[in-house]
């Protein structure tokens, strides 16, 4: 196990008289402040948990120990602590801290009093779909208590990308907006209109689209036009059983004019994971 990471000691320093209070000594975590400054929070890779420090009480709370789903990369294969799955953010007035597990999103009480709640209702785990919050307003530091947030998704089985929406103040399945055999960027929203620009990519090319709802989209660019002059390629997901009995999967690339009656040279490439890039 790699133990060479730098440890940090964090203090809260008064802007009035310069006095300081110890938050945590010799922690492997990275410290950040909540939007209102009521809490300092961090993730500790050795315990695989999130902690908060109250600027009012000075008390440290483990706010994720009641979450029984992994909050970190379960496929980590290097001799170091796995990376955290990340956070969605904070709700208004620092009321709740939204934490990601591998698939779903949890509402945690930064004071450590209320039990964490899976606001995506376990939908992600049940459907092998990862969710990540799309921050449409870069100036906004918190999520409204009853806000309907946009989530970017990837299905780990089909490899489809897409978008869902989710009301923050309810425990319910996210609502599907769009999904398909593409990879999507995080959309950019117009300041004063319900209009979005998003990049959609596949083996056929990558283009920019405009949409009012991210479901019905109009193509803006023709960046991949030059490909028509070339014999391009296709890709498909293949699965097989390895020598140890475990199932594995990968990508099979073929020329666009592939003829199954012909023989072709084959190149095998393997390094970590590539199939999610279908």
Over which residues does each language-model region extend?
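Short, conserved, GDST-rich strand-edge loop motifs in beta-rich repeat architectures
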Residues: 1-7, 55, 72-89, 93-95, ...
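Beta-propeller blade signature
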Residues: 3-17, 52-58, 107, 164-169, ...
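Blade-terminus and WD-like Trp-Asp/Gly-His loop motifs, strongest in beta-propeller folds
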Residues: 31-39, 44, 88-96, 140-147, ...
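A short beta-strand motif characteristic of beta-propeller blades
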Residues: 19-23, 73-78, 117, 173-178
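Short, solvent-exposed loop/turn segments at conserved positions within beta-propeller repeat blades
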Residues: 2-7, 45-46, 99-100, 155-160, ...
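Serine-hydrolase catalytic core recognition
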Residues: 188-278
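Surface-exposed loop and turn segments in beta-propeller and other repeat-based domains
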Residues: 58-83, 119-141, 181-182, 222-236
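A conserved hydrophobic secondary-structure block that centers on an alpha-helix together
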Residues: 1-48
């Amino acid at each position: 196990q790699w133990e060479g990471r730098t440890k940090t000691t964090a203090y809260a320093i008064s802007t009035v008289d310069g006095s300081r209070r110890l938050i945590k000594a010799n922690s492997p975590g990275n410290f950040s402040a909540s939007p209102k400054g009521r809490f300092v929070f961090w993730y500790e890779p050795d315990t695989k948990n999130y902690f908060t420090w109250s600027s009012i009480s000075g008390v440290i709370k483990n706010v994720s120990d009641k979450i029984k789903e992994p909050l970190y990369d379960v496929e980590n294969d290097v001799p170091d602590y796995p990376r955290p799955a990340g956070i969605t953010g904070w709700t208004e007035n620092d009321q709740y801290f939204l934490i990601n597990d591998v698939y779903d999103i949890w509402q945690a009480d930064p004071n450590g009093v209320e039990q964490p709640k899976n606001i995506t209702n376990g939908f992600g785990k049940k459907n092998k779909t990862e969710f990540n919050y799309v921050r449409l307003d870069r100036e906004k530091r918190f999520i409204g208590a009853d806000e309907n947030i946009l989530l970017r998704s990837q299905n780990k089985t089909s490899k489809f990308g897409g978008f869902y929406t989710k009301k923050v103040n309810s425990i319910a399945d996210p609502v599907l907006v769009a999904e398909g055999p593409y990879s999507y960027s995080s959309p950019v929203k117009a300041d004063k209109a319900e209009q979005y620009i998003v990049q959609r990519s596949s083996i056929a090319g990558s283009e920019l689209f405009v949409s009012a709802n991210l479901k019905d989209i109009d193509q803006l660019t023709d960046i991949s036009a030059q490909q028509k002059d070339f014999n391009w390629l296709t890709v498909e997901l293949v699965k097989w059983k390895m020598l140890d009995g475990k199932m594995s999967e990968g990508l099979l690339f073929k020329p666009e004019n592939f003829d199954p009656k012909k023989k072709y040279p084959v190149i095998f490439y393997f390094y970590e994971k590539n199939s999610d890039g279908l």
